[in-house]
Amino acid sequence: MEKQEAFSHWKQQSARKTDVSKKGSVDEDIEETVRLINQQERYFTTSSCSGRVIIINETLDNSTIQKQNCSWLFVTHKLCKPDDVFAALQNATGDVVLKFEPFVLHVQCRALEDAQLLHSVAINAGFRNSGITVGKKGKIIMAVRSTHGLEVPLTQNGKCLVSHEYIEFLVHTANKKMEENKRRITRFHSCLHKALQKEDCVHDKTSKEQASSCVYVRRRKRKDRSRKSNCSSSEEEHTDSEPELTLFNDP
């Protein structure tokens, strides 16, 4: 009971939090999926990204890698064009990297079996790198992840390292990965919807069977009490009649 109360508290806290992502809202391609998950009592999402092509300008030394030392030159959650990359490179001053980052979703789960259901759905949808972690405070997080990312350096110290033809090839490759990513998201949503429906049906069936069993037990108890009452009456009648029989047998 304490775990359920703690989970409910965490879910309420999450619902009140402001979205601190750069975009400030859930990505369009996964809005429906995030809504479906958050409608369930046993789940709530903590972070998400539908997948993106991003060009990052890293202005840092080789000894450290810190997120705050990176600037975004370009980002899109849709298909991109080579011209988008060429335009972004005009502002390059450091080491520029082109990345494709696939769909990622973190979901806090009420119980381990709830996380296992979500994990099974993710694996079947093609997100093979998905996993479950349990924190020190009992927080169960299910991460939906895959490995079909892409990361390629384009410049070093502001100098372009690759040809225009290669950049066009990279954009084509990133777009193919984005299309596959969207297919997996669609598959994940469909599998999740079916799995939740199946769970609800099993739960309803179990509840009905338990209710029916309780009614059956109550009926049996009433019948047993009735039988005992009838037996008691017969025994009383038999006991009362015994003296009369004895009297009739006296000489």
UniProtKB/Swiss-Prot annotation:
One of its GO terms (biological process) is methylation. Its EC number is 2.1.1.282. Residues 1-23, 209-251 are annotated as: Disordered. It is an enzyme of class 2 (transferase). Pathway: tRNA modification; wybutosine-tRNA(Phe) biosynthesis. Transmembrane segments: none annotated. Keywords: Methyltransferase, S-adenosyl-L-methionine, Transferase, tRNA processing. It comes from the Eukaryota. InterPro entries: tRNA_yW-synthesising, tRNA_yW-synthesising-like_sf. Residues 217-228 have a biased composition (Basic residues). GO terms for molecular function: methyltransferase activity. It catalyses: 4-demethyl-7-[(3S)-3-amino-3-carboxypropyl]wyosine(37) in tRNA(Phe) + S-adenosyl-L-methionine = 7-[(3S)-3-amino-3-carboxypropyl]wyosine(37) in tRNA(Phe) + S-adenosyl-L-homocysteine + H(+). Pfam families: TYW3. Belongs to the TYW3 family. Probable S-adenosyl-L-methionine-dependent methyltransferase that acts as a component of the wybutosine biosynthesis pathway. Wybutosine is a hyper modified guanosine with a tricyclic base found at the 3'-position adjacent to the anticodon of eukaryotic phenylalanine tRNA. This is tRNA wybutosine-synthesizing protein 3 homolog.
